[in-house]
Structures are given as C-alpha cells and as structure tokens.
Amino acid sequence: MRDFRLYAITGEEFHPDRSLQAVMEEAILGGVDIIQLRDKKSHKREVLEKARVLQALAKKYDIPLIINDHIDVALAVDADGIHLGQDDLPLSEARKIMGRDKIIGISTHKIEEAREAEKGGADYIGVGPIFETKSKEDVVDPVTTAYIQQVAHEISIPFVAIGGIKLHNVEQVLDAGATRICMISEIVGAEDVKGTCEVFSTILEQRGIGS
C-alpha cells in the first residue's frame, strides 16, 4: 500500500452545519492523504451514498478511501480498503472477501493484538486510543504513548496513532515513535479544517515525515 502520514476519519456530528464533502475536501487540501468513512448509525443506503461522495473525492485527489466495518459498501464503491475493529469480521474472512489488492487496517489496543494483526496479514494497524477521546463510543482506556513505543520497536507493518491527538499533544506522539497520525474531531470539528491540517502537516514535515 502507498504510505501516508495524516489520516482523517469522518465525524459528521462535529460539523452539523457543514456537508461531509466540504469538510473532507478541506482536510485533503490541508494535507490529509488518506480518509476513512466511519458511520455506525446511518441506514446502509445512506452509508452507501456517503461512500460514493467520498470515493469521488478520493479519486479526484488520488488518495485512498477506507470504509470502516461496512465491507459490502466498500465493495460496492470499489473503495481502496476497509478498517476493522477487534469485534468486527475476522481479518482472515475479510481478506477472502476483499482480495489481496485491497487495504485492510485493524484497530489494536495492546501489543498482542498488534502481533496478531501483523501475523494475519493486515496492511496497517491503528494504535490507540493514545489519550482520552470523546469521538468514539464504548472506547477502551487510553493506551498511552508507551504502546506506541512498543509497536514502533516490535511491529514492522505501518501503524497509525489515534485517539485524543491534538495540536498540544501531537509532539508526544511523534516523540514516542509514531510517523502517522489519525484524528476525527480535531480535524473535522475544527473551525478552520484546512488550516488545522496544514499545521499538522507542517509539524510532520519538520520531523522529516513526508507524504
């Protein structure tokens, strides 16, 4: 898979007065180089329509679109991949359905899950939540930057840090060994989405982390 550094996940509850397309396009223009549609509440047809909108956007800017959990929607819009949680469809089954050419990401909260995901053939893993977060319901306790250090030392596939990452603490995340960061509310809930992403992009560039 193509490498990435700044990952944005949808969260429409954080921008009720702005369209999904407008917010995500601003994020891309600010430096986001991979996007994920995450929608646990809408009816399937609505999720499909959102996926079509985002797929058109992803193609326009030549970046990957990942669909969270909805493997049928991912197939329907020919998304670049899917992202699965620990309680979602098993990685081995998802790979049979998606094929070898699609991206499969797995959320992990401890090193044993990271090892299992790598062994099972995941293309990347999510590492988190690093800090407390209100963007996801039923979220596990923060894993802290210590987990980033573990993964950076032991896991060879790409990993992305997620969970409560903000401008005031992102340096801690990078200091721990992360080279890819992912956010929901800090990006899509920002007053200036493009400007916020540009700041994160600059921080990454100053660290020598290219897109």
Curated annotation (Swiss-Prot):
Annotated GO CC locations: cytoplasm
Matching entries from InterPro entries are given as: Aldolase_TIM, ThiamineP_synth_sf, ThiamineP_synth_TenI, TMP_synthase
Q: Which GO terms describe its biological process?
A: thiamine biosynthetic process; thiamine diphosphate biosynthetic process
Class in the EC hierarchy, top level: transferase
- Cofactor binding mode, per the note? Binds 1 Mg(2+) ion per subunit.
EC annotation? 2.5.1.3
Q: Detail which positions bind Mg(2+).
A: D69, D88
The residues listed in the UniProt record as binding 2-[(2R,5Z)-2-carboxy-4-methylthiazol-5(2H)-ylidene]ethyl phosphate, with positions renumbered to this chain, are T133, K134, S135, G164, I184, S185
Reaction it catalyzes:
2-[(2R,5Z)-2-carboxy-4-methylthiazol-5(2H)-ylidene]ethyl phosphate + 4-amino-2-methyl-5-(diphosphooxymethyl)pyrimidine + 2 H(+) = thiamine phosphate + CO2 + diphosphate; 2-(2-carboxy-4-methylthiazol-5-yl)ethyl phosphate + 4-amino-2-methyl-5-(diphosphooxymethyl)pyrimidine + 2 H(+) = thiamine phosphate + CO2 + diphosphate; 4-methyl-5-(2-phosphooxyethyl)-thiazole + 4-amino-2-methyl-5-(diphosphooxymethyl)pyrimidine + H(+) = thiamine phosphate + diphosphate
An MF annotation (GO) of this entry = magnesium ion binding
Q: Which residues bind 4-amino-2-methyl-5-(diphosphooxymethyl)pyrimidine?
A: Q36, L37, R38, D39, K40, N68, S107, K136
Q: Which UniProt keywords apply?
A: Magnesium, Metal-binding, Thiamine biosynthesis, Transferase
Superkingdom per UniProt: Bacteria
The biological pathway it contributes to is: Cofactor biosynthesis; thiamine diphosphate biosynthesis; thiamine phosphate from 4-amino-2-methyl-5-diphosphomethylpyrimidine and 4-methyl-5-(2-phosphoethyl)-thiazole: step 1/1
Return any one Pfam family short name: TMP-TENI
Q: Which cofactor does it need?
A: Mg(2+)
The family annotation for this protein states: Belongs to the thiamine-phosphate synthase family.
Role: Condenses 4-methyl-5-(beta-hydroxyethyl)thiazole monophosphate (THZ-P) and 2-methyl-4-amino-5-hydroxymethyl pyrimidine pyrophosphate (HMP-PP) to form thiamine monophosphate (TMP).
Name recorded for this polypeptide: Thiamine-phosphate synthase
Annotated source species:
Halalkalibacterium halodurans (strain ATCC BAA-125 / DSM 18197 / FERM 7344 / JCM 9153 / C-125) (Bacillus halodurans)
